[in-house]
């Protein structure tokens, strides 16, 4: 009994650690965002009142000679950079409301730009350490209700690394969805994969009609490609046989892939927003701060440092996109 209690306590403490790391990731991204506002404000000589990390009561405060306040607050899930004249009229020529419109616009968008550039930096770091992002068929289903005869040349095997689909690079699972969506049972799609260390081109046969309704339809994608899916008692997908992996490339190719990957992440976010407005997915799919923390903690728990850097880059791009949208 004591052993079981100790094991349970260890699991709880491990999860708490993952949650704390997730909170730290989110805090860093928010701080980077506010730092973008702060730095451009300094460049254009805006009167800055306070730069705060977190929100709520102050636990640390330092006032500079020019009157700027730097503070750390008790709740590490936010932050802000406040400018004089931001909310009310002020006679100071350095006040926000007295600056030129183009300067104010640059200051306003600089937070999102900083998030995006920082996300690209993280992606470059991740790709430099682990290789550029690709998808691996970690586990195929082994089931074939279609009746199509499968061979080594027209179907995936365990641990195939997918590089391209229809001639386009595959970084994330939505790339696969775009490549196969609309295909019918028995159609083929051209793939470039690494199998047993050897790069090869293959024509993979579709094992079902690929009528993928939205970015959440991973179950449909797995059925089409013969990849294993695990579901809970309510028929919700809890895991699938795809895993992210890294592929070593040259320096400049890695840099180019980093930018391309950031565009893919941004495109996925815009796709989700579009599907949300068309009613194809629910508002719950977006989640919130606590959902972000929970998902991040789960990803870190199962995927290690690669997944930590990957989810951090996604959060950075996500913050960049949503802060540029005309949403109050």
Question: What function would you assign to each model-found segment?
Answer:
Residues 2-13, 99, 141-148, 209-321:
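Functional transmembrane alpha-helices
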Residues 14, 18-22, 100-108, 115, ...:
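Residue-level signature of transmembrane alpha-helical entry/exit and packing/kink sites
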Residues 14-91, 317, 322-325:
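Small-residue-rich helix-interface/hinge motifs
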Residues 32, 43, 50, 70, ...:
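Internal alpha-helical transmembrane segments
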Residues 45, 122, 126-131, 278-279, ...:
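Short helix-capping/hinge motifs at transmembrane helix termini and TM-loop junctions
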Residues 66, 77, 158-161, 185:
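Short, flexible surface segments
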Residues 145-174:
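Conserved PDZ fold ligand-binding element
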Residues 163-164, 178-234:
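PDZ-domain C-terminal substructure recognizer with occasional recognition of PDZ-binding tails
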């Amino acid at each position: 009994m004591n052993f079981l209690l100790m094991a349970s306590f260890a699991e709880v403490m491990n999860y708490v650690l993952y949650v704390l790391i997730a909170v730290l990731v989110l805090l860093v991204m928010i701080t980077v965002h506010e730092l973008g506002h702060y730095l451009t404000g300094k460049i254009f000589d805006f009167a800055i009142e306070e730069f705060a990390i977190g929100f709520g009561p102050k636990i640390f405060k330092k006032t500079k000679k020019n009157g700027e306040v730097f503070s750390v607050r008790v709740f590490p899930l936010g932050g802000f950079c406040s400018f004089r004249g931001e909310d009310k009229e002020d006679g100071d020529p350095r006040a926000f409301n007295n600056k030129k419109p183009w300067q104010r616009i640059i200051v306003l968008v600089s937070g999102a730009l900083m998030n995006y550039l920082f996300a690209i930096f993280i992606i470059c770091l991740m790709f430099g350490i682990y290789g550029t992002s690709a998808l691996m068929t970690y586990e195929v289903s082994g089931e074939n209700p279609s009746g199509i005869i499968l061979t080594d040349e027209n179907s995936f095997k365990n641990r195939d690394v997918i590089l391209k689909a229809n001639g386009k690079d595959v970084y994330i699972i939505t790339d696969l969805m775009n490549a196969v969506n609309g295909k019918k049972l028995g159609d083929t799609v051209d793939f470039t994969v690494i199998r047993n260390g050897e790069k090869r081109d293959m024509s993979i046969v579709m094992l079902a009609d690929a009528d993928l309704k939205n970015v959440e339809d991973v179950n449909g994608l797995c059925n089409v490609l013969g990849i294993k899916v695990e579901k809970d008692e309510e028929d919700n997908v809890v895991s699938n046989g795809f895993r992210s992996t890294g592929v070593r490339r040259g320096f400049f190719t890695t840099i180019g892939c980093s930018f391309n990957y950031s565009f893919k992440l941004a495109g996925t976010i815009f796709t989700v927003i579009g599907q949300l407005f068309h009613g194809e997915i629910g508002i719950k799919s977006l989640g919130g701060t606590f959902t972000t923390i929970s998902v991040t903690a789960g990803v870190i728990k199962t995927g290690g440092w690669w997944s930590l850097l990957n989810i951090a880059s996604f959060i950075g791009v996500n913050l960049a996109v949503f802060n540029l949208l005309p949403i109050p």
